[in-house]
Amino acid sequence: MVHSKSLRIAFFGTTSFAAWHLHTLAHLSTHQIIAVFTQEIQISTCKSFLSLHKIAKKYNISLFQSRTLSISDIIYIIKKINVDLIVVVSYGLILPQEILNIPRLGCINVHGSLLPRWRGPAPIQRALEYGDSITGITIIQMDLGIDTGDILHIMPCKIFPKDTSCTLSNRLVNIGSAMLSQVLDQFILGTFTLIPQDSTYATYAHKLNKQEARINWNLSAIQLERCIRAFNPWPISFFQIKNDRIRVWDAEVSNQNINNYSSSTSILPGTILAAHPNGIYVVTGSGILILTMLQISGKKITSVRDLLNAYKEWFKPNSVLE
């Protein structure tokens, strides 16, 4: 049954983050999701991963893979289905003005940061990488810029010391889904307000790539620990041993001094100081990083305690990791 004050919505999204918002809209909302546009099928090791394709199928929503469509095709479809509003969540492509102009209420975007900080495609990961203590969700009225539109709603979210991109994303989904429902109600009632962003405070969250996940031991232990959490569950921080890629799923910063392990004043970053059941202690550009959860190529994720039972020779003290 269609609610008398429901909106006809087209949903644009690609990631699991988007899929959870679609799930909430389709499951709890009185609004009609007429069509879903997505870039491509995605997979993830995150336990909370949700497929946007499965959600569309479950709720019998027409799904279009936009990489196989031209802009003119998308424009034609949007006009034909006669939507009131386009909702964009983690879509990954910029919508041209021709599409933004079609819905009578325009297009809104649910973004995983406190805009204008961390505009761009990887706001959750960059907030963790740079050691932010707080982030949040911002819903904006879209314009042609990258996350530059006026703010409809904004809500903060604390970042905890052991948060990964996966755990932080899970909390942001809950916040974003609730906020989206509120904003849609405001559109129906005509009670929404728009607040311009102050671009002098803007930062940009560049897209992640696999190569930046390679551990640079010249960075500080604090920086590396942040990167390991930021790049979990993708692309996963890694280093090399014997031509094997070793992925690092968890680590912590040691409060011990290098002098506790060696009297040398010229230890190379990447040098293993000790390999204990509780972790592998590695010299960095500043401080010691303790590796606690690792994964050898083709093997399961395992604790260092279990790993050393079979690969102790790989982690001898004074050897240098690549």
Swiss-Prot record:
Give binding positions for (6S)-5,6,7,8-tetrahydrofolate.
Answer: 113-116
Per its UniProt record, what InterPro entries does this chain match? Fmt, Formyl_trans_C, Formyl_trans_C_sf, Formyl_transf_N, Formyl_transf_N_sf, Formyl_transferase-like_C_sf, Met-tRNA-FMT_C, Met-tRNA-FMT_N
**Gene Ontology MF term list:** methionyl-tRNA formyltransferase activity
Q: What class of enzyme is it?
A: transferase
* Keywords annotated in UniProt: Protein biosynthesis, Transferase
Cystine bridges = none
The keyword Transferase is annotated on this UniProt entry: yes
- EC number(s) of the enzyme? 2.1.2.9
Query: What is catalyzed by this enzyme?
Result: L-methionyl-tRNA(fMet) + (6R)-10-formyltetrahydrofolate = N-formyl-L-methionyl-tRNA(fMet) + (6S)-5,6,7,8-tetrahydrofolate + H(+)
**Record has Zinc-finger as a keyword:** no
One GO cellular component term of this record is: cytosol
Q: Which HAMAP family match?
A: Formyl_trans
User: What function does this protein fulfil?
Assistant: Attaches a formyl group to the free amino group of methionyl-tRNA(fMet). The formyl group appears to play a dual role in the initiator identity of N-formylmethionyl-tRNA by promoting its recognition by IF2 and preventing the misappropriation of this tRNA by the elongation apparatus.
Family stated for the protein in its record:
Belongs to the Fmt family.
> What is the name attached to this protein's record?
Methionyl-tRNA formyltransferase
Say which species the protein is native to: Blochmanniella pennsylvanica (strain BPEN)
